[in-house]
Amino acid sequence: MLFQEKHGHALSRKAVDRIFDQVPRKFKSETKDKMNYEDFVWFMLSEEDKTSIRSIQYWFKVIDLDDNRIITPHEMEYFYEEQVHRLEYLNHEPILYVDLLCQMNDLVKPSFEGHFSYDEIKAVRHSVGIFFNCLVNLNKFIAYETRDLFSLKHQLTEFPDYS
């Protein structure tokens, strides 16, 4: 599972703590601090397809520390600082936080720079996965950052043999 060491602790400890504090969704499990099957399915669906409305709600609640329906630079930095430490531990060069924030502003185009409302996040749902992954899922963030842009462009061209 994503919480275990053999998966490289894909999710950040801060995100896992918020999930087990039952912030994004109350557990149906009758055992304290344990997910039951239904809880796990909700989590996995939210983790694997971050473009669905329910998934966006789930991850938005994880990141929105003060529950005001706006993700602020402070909240993003709170989660990203753990990612930076994890990247450095793996000898990856982390992106500076200000650069990451700039990229997220370009992605979402919020009405107030650096402040991302739920509706603004939902409006870019086709590409919102990277917004959440850079803050909570190290493996998916690294995969995104190390993707081959030339190969992607080649795959997207109508006539790849002539590009």
Question: Can you say where each PLM-predicted feature lies in the sequence?
Answer:
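Eukaryotic intrinsically disordered and solvent-exposed regulatory patches
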Residues: 21, 45-47, 58, 102-103, ...
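Amphipathic regulatory helices of Ca2+-sensor modules
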Residues: 1-11, 19-22, 34-48, 71-92, ...
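Intrinsically disordered, low-complexity regulatory segments of kinases
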Residues: 2-8, 14-17, 22, 26, ...
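Hydrophobic alpha-helical bundle architecture
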Residues: 61-63
